[in-house]
């Protein structure tokens, strides 16, 4: 028996079970899920047209999962068991800095490791830095945004139909019913800035891995990653409006883009096969028949 039929006419936690999750909210969830998938796909297509290889995109996906979802979380699980964790969580600023530090160290180290190893032979094409960033930030959007919104949409449809769902219960339904539909679009807005940041940081680490004299860009990327994550965590924990938080993140993202463009212009090299020299002299090779005729004519003249 479904949730609606089971509790019809009753109240549970202040929620009348005749109430349904608004269709507009479901549409917003599906739209956000689409954005999370579409943006990485579009970036992949664009960068392929610009000459990037396909491999960096997939390496970016794998690297994010390995370093952020596996290694970072395993390490964080260990640290959370230490006595010092109570001190960290009791101070919002300290917590924000530590959270940002974990993300920065693991994700930027993952980038650097990927560029130095599996993508070593692809470093001649700087477009691959952008392609990697699209994969790194894209898989994060798909996991954190698209997957979540798809599951929420399925739950909402099942709940409205009176069908029990493995994806949630009364509390989840009440949250979605009371939430304005536009709140469900914020994730999509946030992911656009996040992917932009990932691509920008990928450019910094790319040139750090490519040129030993630019190694300082690697620790800089860690600090920048720490900064943006710390700002988001601290503002959110302080109860600041979500729009102010997103505005701050977008300002930071724009600053990162400006920095990445500057680094790109100073360090970018064009592959020879990408842009052949227009003024290169053209060597004319004579056809064998023509060469033979000229040789014969020269012999007759000498005779």
Go through each PLM region and give its residues.
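Hydrophobic alpha-helical segments at protein termini of multi-pass membrane proteins
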Residues: 13, 17-303
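Short, Lys/Arg-enriched N-terminal segments with co-localized hydrophobic residues
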Residues: 1-16
């Amino acid at each position: 028996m479904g949730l609606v039929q089971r509790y019809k006419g009753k109240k549970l936690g202040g929620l009348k079970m005749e109430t349904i999750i608004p269709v507009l909210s479901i549409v917003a969830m599906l739209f956000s899920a689409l954005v999370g998938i579409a943006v990485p796909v579009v970036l992949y297509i664009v960068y392929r047209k610009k000459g990037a290889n396909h491999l960096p995109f997939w390496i970016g996906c794998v690297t994010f999962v390995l370093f952020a979802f596996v290694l970072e979380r395993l390490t964080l699980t260990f640290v959370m068991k230490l006595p010092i964790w109570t001190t960290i969580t009791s101070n919002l600023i300290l917590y924000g800095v530590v959270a940002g530090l974990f993300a920065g160290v693991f994700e930027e180290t993952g980038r650097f490791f990927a560029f130095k190893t599996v993508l070593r032979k692809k470093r001649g094409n700087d477009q691959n830095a952008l392609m990697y960033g699209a994969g790194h930030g894209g898989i994060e959007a798909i996991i954190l945004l698209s997957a979540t919104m798809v599951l929420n949409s399925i739950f909402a449809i099942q709940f409205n139909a009176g069908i029990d769902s493995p994806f949630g219960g009364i509390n989840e339904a009440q949250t979605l019913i009371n939430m304005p539909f536009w709140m469900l679009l914020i994730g999509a807005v946030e992911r656009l800035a996040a992917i932009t940041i990932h691509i920008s940081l990928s450019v910094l680490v790319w040139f750090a891995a490519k040129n030993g004299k630019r190694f300082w860009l690697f620790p800089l990327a860690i600090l920048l990653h720490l900064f943006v994550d710390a700002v988001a965590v601290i503002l959110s924990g302080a109860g600041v409006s979500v729009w102010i938080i997103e505005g701050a993140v977008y300002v930071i993202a724009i600053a990162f883009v400006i920095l990445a463009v500057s680094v790109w212009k100073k360090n970018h090299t064009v592959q020879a096969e990408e842009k052949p020299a227009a003024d290169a002299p053209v060597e004319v090779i004579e056809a064998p028949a023509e060469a033979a005729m000229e040789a014969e004519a020269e012999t007759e003249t000498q005779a």
